[in-house]
């Protein structure tokens, strides 16, 4: 255990040293010899969805053992370890296109997790606070929270999208970026091997010359390392264009004059008719167009300017409190910078939106800065509250209702107009499973959009899914929606009983009781920042050193894995029933017992027959 602590202490020392962005790391390849880093890596990924999906070689994490780790380390020592080609599958996207996903062999995944933990120790301390994708303690919600809290006053929003970002990252440019902080060619070459591993698609092998493989464990952090240069570039632009101070900000007289002119023209048009009215409204629209291209404020040096920036993976937005010309200039500068890095702005997705009159989109959320109408707010002066008319320049966020309904339609919950439908693919499930499945879809949507303004907009989505669940139950039982609600209530409560008829559990559709808007209701979890303690915990709980829990033999012990311990609509049979009773997806077994499990010879065994039942249950 002391050796384990030394391994993790070294990683923690690397993390602390790299709080200095100029620090250069050397002799880190030797960490790839540390058995305990592989054990912690295995423990971290062993139960994640997809890790029982076979790679191209047909292997899974089943039969993973200490011997597997030691074989990897021996290959690391003579530098003969190679990453095998991943199996590529195409995943459908909402727009009808597909995105590639790579399924790597299990040993490759464990090695990648070790590499990822080392790269995280090197780069995480100095990653930008504006970068939120694939980082501990960061998420879509932290990115949107940053916009909510710091984007007041923004007049223009640049929606940024990098065309095929993950697929087009230059390997040579990425390696050059890594070499700025890593002076260890053996470690660099190991990463190069991972990048060059290629993939199999429909049985044919394709070499990889560009991009980080999607679905790879190290792909997200490598993308963040590469895009960190974009973060630094934009942050320099933020400093370069920082102009004026808050106390210097005054309203531009020309802006106020044009504003009064627009208001006067609209009032005049209300009293007119026909062609005369149309001509006046045309002048009002012309005045409004000029207003949209102007900043409302001046400073002593004739211009108050602020630039904001947030990035999540390859999605980013820039906010400009200043003229549209500056927004256009920034888009051009960023596009040129990305081109020099070997990437390309997606022209069809990179828009400049007026923050008040147009809607920008970021991370599935519609974004505007305030509204066009002024409102009365209470301000505090000398301890007393006074009413003040303000223009409303704070960020406002909404759910994209039309897109959500279209997505629900594509998944069979409603028709194109949002009318609930029977979910035919689930009518063969148990009643509680139908309510749980459809309820989980609704729970995911309401949790993601918990922070939006006008939260009650989501009542439409709740209605669709609540009634889709009721219609599915009605179809299954050849009944009607009204009878289902009469029997189970509005929340579709289903009671689950044991063989004696006793209620052991009940399931309900998660209905919202209060539609009160809470703009600060972001779902942000706590972060376990103690790497040493967390890693030792993973290492300590590992059963990779344990004997066989069935017969207590120490001969060729490996982990027996199952893909699921519970799966809706399927009866649990055979040896899997033991794992269900243990609530475990992996147990250590010797080679002989492992063969018997797969041959079905232990299908009738129970936990009391195990030589080490407590180890199995731990």
From Swiss-Prot:
Mg(2+) binds at residues 161, 314-315. Disruption phenotype: Deletion of the gene does not affect nicotine catabolism. CDD domains: RT_G2_intron. Keywords: Magnesium, Metal-binding, NAD, Oxidoreductase. The keyword Metal-binding applies. GO terms for biological process: homing of group II introns; mRNA processing. Induction: Expression in nicotine culture is about 5 times as in glycerol culture. Residues 72-367 form the Reverse transcriptase domain. One of its GO terms (molecular function) is RNA-directed DNA polymerase activity. Its cofactor is FMN. It comes from the Bacteria. The keyword Nucleotide-binding does not apply. SUPFAM superfamilies: DNA/RNA polymerases. No similarities to sequences of bacterial dehydrogenase or oxidase are found. Moreover, the reverse transcriptase catalytic domain analysis revealed three possible magnesium binding sites in the nicA sequence. In addition, NicA has no significant homology with other genes for degradation of heterocyclic compounds. Therefore, the sequence of NicA seems to be unique among the sequences of bacterial nicotine catabolic genes and more closely related to sequences of higher organisms. PANTHER family: COX1/OXI3 INTRON 1 PROTEIN-RELATED (PTHR33642), COX1_OXI3 INTRON 1 PROTEIN-RELATED (PTHR33642:SF4). In the N-terminal section; belongs to the bacterial reverse transcriptase family. It is hypothesized that the pyrrolidine ring of nicotine is oxidized by NicA to form N-methylmyosmine. The spontaneous ring opening of N-methylmyosmine due to the addition of water generates pseudooxynicotine, which is further oxidized to 3-succinoylpyridine (SP) by NicA through two hypothesized unstable compounds and the removal of methylamine. This is Putative nicotine oxidoreductase.
């Amino acid at each position: 255990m002391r050796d384990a602590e030394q391994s993790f202490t070294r990683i923690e020392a690397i993390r602390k040293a790299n709080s200095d962005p100029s620090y250069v790391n050397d002799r880190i390849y030797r960490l790839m010899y540390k058995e305990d880093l592989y054990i912690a890596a295995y423990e971290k990924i062993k139960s994640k969805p997809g890790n029982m999906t076979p790679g191209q070689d047909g292997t899974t994490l089943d039969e993973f053992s200490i011997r597997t780790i030691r074989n990897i380390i021996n290959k690391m020592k003579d530098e003969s370890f190679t990453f095998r080609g991943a199996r590529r599958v195409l995943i459908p996207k909402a727009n009808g296109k597909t995105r590639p996903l790579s399924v790597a062999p299990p040993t490759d995944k464990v090695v990648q997790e070790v590499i990822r933990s080392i790269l995280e120790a090197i780069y995480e301390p100095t990653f930008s606070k504006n970068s939120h994708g694939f980082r501990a303690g960061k998420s879509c919600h932290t990115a949107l929270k940053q916009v909510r809290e710091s984007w007041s006053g923004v007049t223009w929003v640049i929606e940024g999208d990098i065309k095929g970002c993950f697929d087009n990252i230059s390997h040579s440019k990425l390696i050059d970026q890594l070499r700025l902080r890593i002076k260890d060619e053996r470690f660099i070459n190991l990463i190069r091997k991972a990048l060059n591993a290629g993939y199999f698609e429909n049985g044919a092998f394709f070499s990889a010359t560009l991009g980080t493989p999607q679905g790879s464990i190290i792909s997200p952090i490598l993308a963040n390392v590469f895009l960190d240069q974009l973060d630094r570039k934009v942050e320099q632009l933020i400093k370069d264009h920082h102009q004026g101070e808050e106390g210097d900000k005054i309203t531009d007289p020309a802006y106020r004059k044009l504003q009064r002119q627009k208001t006067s023209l609209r009032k005049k048009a209300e009293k007119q008719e026909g062609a005369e009215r149309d001509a006046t409204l045309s002048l009002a629209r012309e005045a409004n167009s000029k207003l949209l291209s102007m900043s409302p404020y001046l400073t002593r040096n004739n211009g108050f300017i602020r630039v904001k920036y947030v990035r999540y993976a390859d999605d980013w937005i820039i906010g400009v409190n200043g003229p549209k010309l500056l927004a256009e200039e920034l888009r051009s500068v960023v596009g040129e910078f990305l081109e020099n890095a070997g990437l390309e702005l997606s022209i069809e997705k990179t828009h400049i939106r007026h923050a008040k009159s147009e809607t920008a989109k970021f991370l599935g959320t519609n974004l505007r800065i305030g509204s066009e109408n002024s409102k009365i707010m209470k301000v505090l002066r000398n301890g007393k509250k006074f009413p003040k008319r303000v223009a409303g320049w704070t960020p406002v966020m909404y759910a994209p209702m039309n897109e959500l309904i279209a997505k629900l339609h594509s998944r069979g919950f409603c028709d194109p107009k949002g009318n609930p439908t029977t979910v035919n693919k689930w009518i063969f499930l148990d009643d509680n499973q139908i309510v749980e499945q459809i309820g989980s879809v609704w729970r995911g949507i309401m949790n993601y959009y918990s922070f939006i303004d006008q939260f009650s907009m989501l009542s439409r989505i709740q209605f669709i899914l609540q009634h889709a669940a009721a219609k599915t139950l009605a179809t299954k039982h050849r009944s009607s929606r009204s009878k289902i609600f009469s029997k189970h209530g509005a929340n579709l409560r289903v009671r689950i009983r044991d063989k004696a008829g006793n209620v052991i559990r009940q399931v309900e559709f998660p209905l919202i009781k209060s539609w009160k808007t809470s703009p600060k209701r972001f779902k942000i979890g706590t972060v376990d920042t103690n790497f040493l303690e967390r890693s030792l915990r993973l290492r300590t709980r590992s059963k990779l050193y344990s004997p066989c829990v069935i017969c207590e033999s120490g001969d060729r012990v490996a982990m027996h894995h199952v893909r699921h311990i519970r799966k809706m609509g399927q009866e649990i049979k055979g040896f899997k029933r033991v794992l269900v009773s243990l609530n475990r997806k992996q147990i250590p077994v010797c080679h002989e017992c492992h063969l018997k499990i797969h041959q079905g010879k232990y299908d009738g065994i129970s936990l009391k027959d195990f030589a080490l039942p407590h180890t199995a249950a731990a």
